[in-house]
């Protein structure tokens, strides 16, 4: 009788675990479908990446100006102001609604973007403490904030760029200057935009 009771308990526990496993599998499948949908809908954030090319080009131009360092750094901050309007315009041109709320994960992407705003406090500190290194730190923060998008958009490109920009910026910023960092960031973003285009093409083919 005892043995039978144990068997029933074991069967019940096994059944419950099976239900949990199936539930987790279903939820994971739904999330993966949502990730695929948002990657296609938002074209893996291509409007923002294309805008970042323009922004880093502006920062590059500012960095070569023969003006006071504090004024130069202030202008570098101002270069980021057109991010949303430019991304919206580019989004319209390539048929992407950057403010779309159709996909629940869209809000998560917005939170990832806001995350960068917190790290900008570090850049503000560098602005006053080590002004000549501000572009370097700014580039490092910019690159690092891209990392969560590698999960959201299922993109290896985001992973590589999120790691390479901070590392390259640190090396160039410590050995050379902010102008070199801005030029490198601009070039990387151009290449990255091309990589995302190829990833999207591959996703469409599949």
Residue ranges and their predicted role:
Residues 120-166:
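Membrane-proximal helix-loop-helix units in multi-pass membrane proteins
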Residues 16, 20-39:
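Short, Lys/Arg-rich, polar N-terminal cytosolic tail immediately upstream
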Residues 52-56, 112-122, 162-166:
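Core segments of transmembrane alpha-helices
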């Amino acid at each position: 009788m005892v043995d039978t009771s144990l068997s029933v308990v074991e069967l019940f526990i096994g059944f419950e675990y099976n239900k949990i496993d199936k539930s987790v599998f279903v939820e994971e499948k739904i999330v993966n479908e949502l990730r695929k949908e948002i990657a296609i809908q938002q074209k893996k954030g291509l409007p923002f990446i294309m805008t970042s090319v323009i922004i880093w080009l502006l920062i590059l131009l500012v960095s070569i100006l023969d003006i006071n360092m504090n004024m130069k750094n202030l202008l570098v901050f101002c270069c980021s102001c057109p991010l949303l309007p430019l991304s919206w315009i580019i989004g319209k041109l390539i048929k992407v609604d950057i403010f779309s709320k159709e996909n629940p994960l869209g809000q998560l992407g917005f939170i990832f973007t806001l995350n960068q705003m917190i790290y900008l406090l570090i850049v503000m500190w560098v602005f006053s403490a080590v002004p000549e290194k501000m572009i370097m730190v700014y580039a490092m923060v910019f690159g690092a904030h891209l990392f969560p998008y590698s999960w959201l958009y299922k993109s290896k490109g985001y992973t590589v760029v999120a790691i390479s920009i901070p590392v390259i910026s640190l090396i160039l910023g410590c050995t050379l200057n902010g102008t070199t960092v801005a030029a490198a960031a601009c070039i990387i973003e151009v290449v990255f935009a091309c990589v995302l285009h190829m990833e999207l093409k591959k996703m469409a083919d599949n």
